[in-house]
């Protein structure tokens, strides 16, 4: 069968034809990829073929070159480069020849060119491509289609390739793009393709922005494009301004007054949503930049140096113009608004919040008149906008300035919780939630707390969108009430607090809310469970009877849920069922933490039975397994040594968790649980250690185990050693060799994620060494001789700490662990340590840094280690 016919059948309505065509194409790609792609490129390049065939051919060429997964993409690119150079040359010729010949948009050829370019340019191949593309755009004889598809190709290349690969070509690329963007260009399609290409190229044109004359020209062309009658070009040009503001803030002063301010403020007022959104986004970005600069300025001041970059305070200067437009935009809400639709009204709310955080007290006088004028407006849109504006400015200004305003507004807000408009009630509930979170002392006052609680309790019965915000308000209120309560010096928790009298009713109402049939809407069910967790966690002693009742309700629900499991049919039911199991597990954790030890012993059999059943039934769902492991972990915490009786029954499921490489969160939870078991069971963990140590060591050596699990495993070795003391000797050699290997890991320092990982790995190593030394040393006055087994490694351990001290990327918590380990080495090995430390002056610098830390733990450990070293010095 002819290739063209098969390609046309890839869109056939007949399922059999479609599947046969796909199967043929897949087979052809496997049998002989080079020949297959050459044939496809001929189909693509031939204008006589149908549009369907050409587009399908383009997809078949492009798809084996690109993937969203960077690892797969790299494999694809290697596979392409392995194709014989002459075949690749032929394909590239046909693909380039296609540019400008397609009568459809977007161009398939431009995507193919970009796919090949990203594979070849990175290995210094296809040097003639960029000059060829530039010529296509700048040649006066080029057609509109040629220029448009070529600029699309340039845009795709800029979007997908590592910017460093194109820096040396930035002048040529920019020449082509600016040529296509100029107002003299007759075709708006060409201008659009060029403007989109510029957006993708901004990262690597820094050298051009650094030169004043080039920068002026780029800015002129972009500003002119924002005035294009074609909305698509206008939006793309504004997107460029938004991004330029982030990347090149320091250069914008010249353009802000004469151009950018007027362009963006006009855009904000535009009737067309896409245009208005970009105008608002521009000012949101200004706020983001200026907040970063404020942080930089305060850090520089702390260190007594001038900041590298300074803020020009554009946001503060523009407040009087921006706020009226934003508050007016807040009145354009859609009554049946879907949460997922991003529109100017939502963007205006976010921009107001950012302005409040950025400009602090200065925003209040600009927003307050609007709130006062409209909070009782007969038009619901204005009432809603006023409440929204109020909620938006609660974070940023000083609380002393906001608190009197909030207290004054409280009766009105309580009244608005009963507003006829659901939109107003929703926004009011959100605003009350923000007050509870950000200015709780205004909510927890003698005058308004009772009516506020009453209206919130009633609000739990409202529409899901309102009730969901009410749940969030309860979460914040519970935490604030607990923190505001008086606690006797010798007590951990308050005997009573301001929610005590309503506690039982609130809990009862929240439990009812979790059971609402419409609980899946607006995330209501999980919001209600989270509120329940917060309120139980933050309860006073006199609320304990209600906590006991809640515990029984949650246990009963868990049992009910497990009974329904066998009747589940559909996938959507299964998802809801798993979510419910996870929520119940999380709630169970919270109530267990509050339950007194005696009560915990009475219910632990039933709890454990439910959790074991859950492990049996949820082998397929990692999320639920993780939550169930966390619940077991809490039970271990509450029961302590009494958990031993469940170990035999639980061990198989712990093993499954430790072996779950595919879902690393489950594996992480299982590893963490091993540490909890060691702390709770102490030496009673011994009979289970051989097996657990075997799995942990296997995981460390296994390529398929996610890297984030490995630092935790190292740390758990320390927990095992602390629990079993001298019995750890049998694992000592293999563990010390593993630690020696792990502590020598190197990473790419330009990759922040890897730098974080390296710090975690080092912390894990130090925690392991600490646990081993403390475990073997014993906690008696006299050091147990077993610890001398570590003596040969002491020099290596100190060199490791010295190496960390010299690495400027070390974190505060690594300093804390390192200091603790130095102190332990001193107490275990005495004067030998002193000589080794003296030979490594960086260690003293590390301890000095620790003593100056803002974190108490780090300060305490560093001071202790310094004292231990001083003791040894005095003895010597």
From Swiss-Prot:
Similarity remark: Belongs to the importin beta family. Importin beta-1 subfamily.
Chief place of localization: cytoplasm
Location of this chain's protein in the cell: Cytoplasm; Nucleus envelope
Residue ranges, annotated region (Ran-GTP binding): 334-419
Transmembrane regions: none
Region (IAB-binding) residue spans: 329-342
Lineage: Eukaryota, Metazoa, Chordata, Craniata, Vertebrata
Leader peptide range in chain numbering: none
Gene3D superfamilies listed in its UniProt record: Leucine-rich Repeat Variant
Name of the molecule in the record: Importin subunit beta
Any one Gene Ontology molecular-function term assigned to this protein's record: nuclear import signal receptor activity
UniProt xrefs under InterPro entries: ARM-like, ARM-type_fold, Armadillo, HEAT_type_2, Importin-beta_N, Importin_beta
Tree of life domain: Eukaryota
Span of domain Importin N-terminal: 21-101
Keywords: Cytoplasm, Nucleus, Protein transport, Repeat, Transport
Oligomeric form and interacting partners: Forms a complex with an importin alpha subunit.
Any GO CC annotation of this UniProt entry: nucleus
One GO term (biological process): protein import into nucleus
Job of this protein: Required for nuclear protein import and mediates docking of import substrate to distinct nucleoporins.
Pfam families: HEAT_EZ, IBN_N
HEAT repeat boundaries on the chain: 2-31, 33-65, 85-123, 129-160, 170-202, 212-247, 253-302, 314-360, 364-394, 402-438, 449-485, 500-537, 544-592, 600-639, 644-681, 686-724, 732-776, 786-829, 831-873
């Amino acid at each position: 069968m002819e290739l063209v016919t098969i390609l046309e059948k890839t869109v056939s309505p007949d399922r059999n034809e479609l599947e046969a065509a796909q199967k043929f194409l897949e087979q052809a790609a496997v049998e002989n990829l080079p020949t297959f792609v050459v044939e496809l490129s001929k189909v693509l390049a031939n204008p006589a073929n149908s549009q369907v065939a050409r587009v399908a051919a383009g997809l078949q060429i492009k798809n084996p070159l690109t993937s969203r997964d960077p690892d797969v993409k790299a494999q694809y690119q290697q596979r392409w480069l392995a194709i014989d150079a002459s075949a690749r040359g032929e394909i590239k010729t046909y693909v380039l020849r296609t540019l400008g010949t397609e009568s459809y948009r977007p161009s398939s050829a431009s995507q193919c060119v970009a796919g090949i370019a990203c594979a070849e340019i990175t290995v210094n191949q296809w040097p003639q491509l960029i000059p060829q593309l530039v010529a296509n755009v700048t040649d006066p004889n080029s057609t509109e289609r040629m220029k448009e598809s070529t600029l699309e190709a340039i845009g795709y290349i800029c979007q997908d390739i590592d910017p460093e690969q194109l820096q040396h070509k930035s002048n040529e690329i920019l020449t082509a793009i600016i040529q296509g963007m100029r107002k003299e260009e007759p075709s708006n399609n060409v201008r659009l393709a060029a403007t989109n290409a510029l957006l993708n190229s901004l990262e690597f044109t820094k050298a051009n922005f650094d030169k004043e004359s080039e920068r002026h020209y780029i800015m002129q062309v972009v500003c002119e494009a924002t005035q294009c009658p074609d909305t698509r070009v206008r939006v793309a040009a504004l997107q460029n301004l938004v991004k330029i503001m982030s990347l090149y803030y320091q250069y914008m002063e010249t353009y802000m007054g004469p151009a950018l301010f007027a362009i963006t403020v006009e855009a904000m007022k535009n009737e067309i949503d896409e245009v208005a959104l970009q105008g608002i986004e521009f000012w949101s970005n200004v706020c983001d930049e200026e907040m970063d600069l404020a942080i930089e300025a305060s850090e520089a001041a702390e260190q007594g140096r001038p900041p590298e970059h300074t803020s020009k305070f554009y946001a503060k200067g523009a407040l009087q113009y921006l706020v009226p437009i934003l508050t007016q935009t807040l009145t354009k809400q859609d009554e049946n608004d879907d949460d997922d639709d991003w529109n100017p009204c939502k963007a205006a709310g976010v921009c107001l919040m950012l302005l409040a955080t950025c400009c602090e007290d200065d925003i209040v006088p600009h927003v307050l008149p609007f709130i006062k004028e409209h909070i009782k407006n007969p038009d619901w849109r204005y009432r809603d906008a006023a409440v929204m504006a109020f909620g938006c400015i609660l974070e940023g200004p000083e609380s002393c300035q906001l608190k009197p305003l909030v207290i004054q507004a409280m009766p009105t807000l309580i009244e608005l919780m009963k507003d006829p408009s659901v939109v107003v009630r929703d926004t009011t509930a959100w605003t009350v939630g923000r007050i509870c979170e950000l200015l709780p002392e205004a909510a927890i006052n003698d005058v308004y707390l009772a009516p506020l609680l009453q209206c919130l309790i009633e609000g739990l019965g409202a529409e899901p969108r309102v009730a969901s915000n009410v749940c969030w308000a309860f979460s914040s209120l519970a935490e604030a009430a607990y923190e505001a309560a008086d606690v006797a010096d010798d007590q951990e928790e308050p005997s009573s607090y301001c929610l005590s009298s309503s506690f039982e009713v609130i809990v009862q109402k929240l439990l009812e809310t979790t059971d609402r049939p419409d609980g899946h809407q607006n995330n209501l069910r999980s919001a209600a469970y989270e509120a329940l967790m917060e309120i139980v966690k933050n309860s006073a002693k006199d609320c304990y009877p209600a906590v006991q009742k809640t515990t029984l309700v949650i246990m009963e629900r868990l049992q009910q849920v497990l009974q329904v499991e066998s009747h589940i049919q559909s996938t959507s039911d299964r998802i809801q069922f798993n979510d419910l199991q996870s929520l119940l597990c999380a709630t169970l954790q919270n109530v267990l933490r509050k339950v007194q030890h005696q009560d915990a012993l009475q219910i632990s059999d039933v709890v454990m039975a439910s959790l074991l059943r859950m492990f049996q039934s949820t082998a397929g769902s990692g999320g639920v397994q993780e939550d169930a492991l966390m619940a077991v972990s809490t039970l271990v915490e509450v029961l302590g040594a009494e958990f031993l009786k469940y170990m035999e029954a639980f061990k198989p499921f712990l093993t499954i968790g430790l072996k779950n490489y595919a879902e690393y969160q489950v594996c992480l939870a299982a590893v963490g649980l091993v540490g909890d078991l060691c702390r709770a069971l102490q030496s009673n963990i011994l009979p289970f250690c051989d097996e657990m140590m075997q799995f942990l060591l296997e995981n460390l050596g296994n390529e398929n185990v996610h890297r984030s699990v490995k630092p935790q495993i190292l740390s758990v070795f320390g927990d095992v050693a602390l629990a079993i003391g001298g019995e750890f000797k049998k694992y000592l050699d293999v563990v010390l060799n593993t630690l020696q290997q792990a502590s020598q890991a190197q990473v790419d320092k330009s990759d922040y994620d890897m730098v974080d990982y390296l710090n975690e790995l080092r912390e894990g190593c130090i925690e392991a060494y600490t646990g081993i030394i403390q475990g073997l040393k014993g906690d008696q006055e006299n050091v147990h001789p077993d610890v001398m087994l570590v003596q040969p490694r002491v020099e290596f351990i100190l060199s490791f700490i010295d190496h960390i001290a010299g690495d400027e990327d070390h974190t505060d918590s690594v300093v804390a662990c390192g200091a603790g380990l130095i102190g332990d080495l001193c107490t275990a090995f005495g004067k030998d340590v002193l000589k080794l430390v003296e030979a490594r002056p960086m260690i003293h610098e590390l301890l000095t840094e620790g003593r100056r830390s803002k974190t108490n733990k780090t300060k305490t450990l560093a001071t202790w280690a310094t004292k231990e070293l001083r003791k040894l010095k005095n003895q010597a």
